[in-house]
Amino acid sequence: MNSLFASTARGLEELLKSELEALGAHDCKIVQGGVHFQGDDRLMYQSLLWSRLASRILLPLNEFKVYSDLDLYLGVQAIDWPSIFGVDKTFAVHFSGVNDEIRNSQYGALKVKDAIVDSFTRKMDQRPTVAKQQPDIRVNVFLQRDMASVALDLSGEGLHQRGYRDLTGQAPLKENLAAAIIQRSGWQPGTPMVDPMCGSGTLLIEAAMMASDRAPGLHRGHWGFTAWNAFNEALWRELTTEAQVRARRGLLETSSRFFGSDIDRRVIEMARANARRAGVAELITFNANDISKLVNPLPEGPVGTVISNPPYGERLESEPALIALHNMFGRMMKTAFGGWRLSLFSASPELLSCLQLRADREFKAKNGPLDCVQKNYQLTANPQGAGGALVAEDYANRLRKNVKKLDKWAKQQGIECYRLYDADLPDYNVAVDRYGSKVVVQEYAPPKTIDPQKARQRLFDVINATLAVLELPSNQLVLKTRERQKGKNQYEKLAQKGEFLLVSEYNAKLWVNLTDYLDTGLFLDHRIARQMLGKMSQGKDFLNLFAYTGTASVHAGLGGARSTTTVDMSRTYLEWAEKNLRANGLTGQQHRLIQADCLSWLSNTDEQFDVIFIDPPTFSNSKRMETTFDVQRDHLVLMKELKRLLRRKGTIMFSNNKRGFQMDLAGIAALGLEAKEITALTQSEDFARNRQIHNCWLVTHSQEEK
């Protein structure tokens, strides 16, 4: 009897144990990441040929304590290596684990290699060659704390490499994980299977191999035991011949049929090629189709299983489309696949909730580093595909109410960009802004006390409801997460799309970018302030400090300003401001753009202006600014500098976003200035619920100064 170890992905150990026992293994014991078992040579070869779930089959050779690198060397050298493989064979060492003495796996592998080579040279005065690619013999060493285990890897390459998949689509499933997903899905051989997002076809091919009784190792061209001195070639030939006979018979006898589709034609061609190499092409029908065109291939029966590993998305921007996809997919399942089973494997349980289906079984497993879940559903017939109650119903009702009121108001105002929802309900802490035909949903970062998975689920519910209420295609919704920006983060790109959208605000045309930055280039809450500046600027010299994308300069220019001067520290935003000015025909030397630290520029200029707009940050500590700036602490210093530039009958519009800001009116008076708060006048209908989003003041020379 041989003592053997079969490794597998975490979470699949119980399934693997059952599989090995069905093959005839004895004394199976589960450990994390695998199963120890006993078996004769026939069982050993059968496990290699027939296990659909094992990653590797290892033959343990020695186990010993390791307190130093010398212990490791001597423990490996104690094995009679020339009795295991010939000196003319190549070998490789796979070493995993570290302890206090062996702190680097590469160093550990080097010591093992030296011990094996020295074992040969001492006994034979010859040495075998190390080969990194497809070695004849693969030695596996696992070090955990002070215990090392040395084993012969009988698999060679991982057993998930069946030999049929040369090319793959993006993010493939390993074949042994795919086999586990199928076994857990409840699918029965003899019944049909559909994978509507099949990629390179792994799930369908693995199921077809099961249905046709085809051994998963039948197509492998390289093994880790053929150069082993104890290799029983006759027994191996007998077992593979038997497997070939079973595969031919199974292909003829199976009644299972398989159907796969994917939007990517290139990947579908790969899937077809993979199925041909696996010997099951005649059982599988592949089509290049968008999932929205999915139909039941067997509407008259029999019923079967829909199984898939749908996309889950790694970037925030992809989530609206994925939420819409899962929502649509859930409706399609109820409409066209009543009576079937559905099984989905995903790294995002939140996306699976968008199906609006109730799972009857759930499993957990790892897909590489990802924690994944598999959910099984029994689909009931529902020709209309009607779902249950709309998710986030309170939010949906509030959004619907706001839209009815604000869409009409915005049309009357002549604006295309406005806020539809602003954390109106505490459970749904998002802002929803309309920009022409597009909508931006910004999630305010939840407190650290909120469970991240619950917060993500609630966000997905919001997106689902937003798409439904606004009847919006998913590619028209942009998702962002708003957090406090520090230092240069406010200027850094979130994406690299470079997609600009031209929108209308009263008589101005303004460019916005909804994807590349945290902000879009247009502060919606300052809309009325910009309109006021336009009316104030006719025939005047206008200065815009901390100008951002220069939208206030555009309104001043369109209002008939004699000149506009736009100052900001960011080259990116100044180029954007120039683009905005140009879109409104505001070109020429009278429209200046200056890249500078606004505070330094203010201290060093003696120019005079009639209208000054300043909207400074609440706090800034940019490296390009020599000192920090706090709007509450420093607003008098700012006003003192602005007074120098303000003509006698001029006006400063001063705005900021600091909640609870207190204007030092006594200090203002001491400077010879007067300040009047106009916050209420600058707040529009779409920000009626958020009276503290900004505060705004008009500052002029006092009567005595004039």
UniProtKB/Swiss-Prot annotation:
Keywords: Cytoplasm, Methyltransferase, RNA-binding, rRNA processing, S-adenosyl-L-methionine, Transferase. It catalyses: guanosine(2445) in 23S rRNA + S-adenosyl-L-methionine = N(2)-methylguanosine(2445) in 23S rRNA + S-adenosyl-L-homocysteine + H(+); guanosine(2069) in 23S rRNA + S-adenosyl-L-methionine = N(2)-methylguanosine(2069) in 23S rRNA + S-adenosyl-L-homocysteine + H(+). SUPFAM superfamilies: S-adenosyl-L-methionine-dependent methyltransferases (SSF53335). Residues 43-154 form the THUMP domain. The keyword ATP-binding does not apply. Gene3D superfamilies: 3.30.2130.30, RNA methyltransferase domain (HRMD) like, Vaccinia Virus protein VP39. GO terms for molecular function: 23S rRNA (guanine(2445)-N(2))-methyltransferase activity; RNA binding; rRNA (guanine-N7-)-methyltransferase activity. CDD domains: AdoMet_MTases, THUMP_AdoMetMT. PROSITE patterns: THUMP, UPF0020. GO terms for cellular component: cytoplasm. Its EC number is 2.1.1.173, 2.1.1.264. The keyword Chloroplast does not apply. It is an enzyme of class 2 (transferase). It is found in: Cytoplasm. Belongs to the methyltransferase superfamily. RlmKL family. Specifically methylates the guanine in position 2445 (m2G2445) and the guanine in position 2069 (m7G2069) of 23S rRNA. HAMAP family: 23SrRNA_methyltr_KL. This is Ribosomal RNA large subunit methyltransferase K/L. It comes from Yersinia pseudotuberculosis serotype O:1b (strain IP 31758).
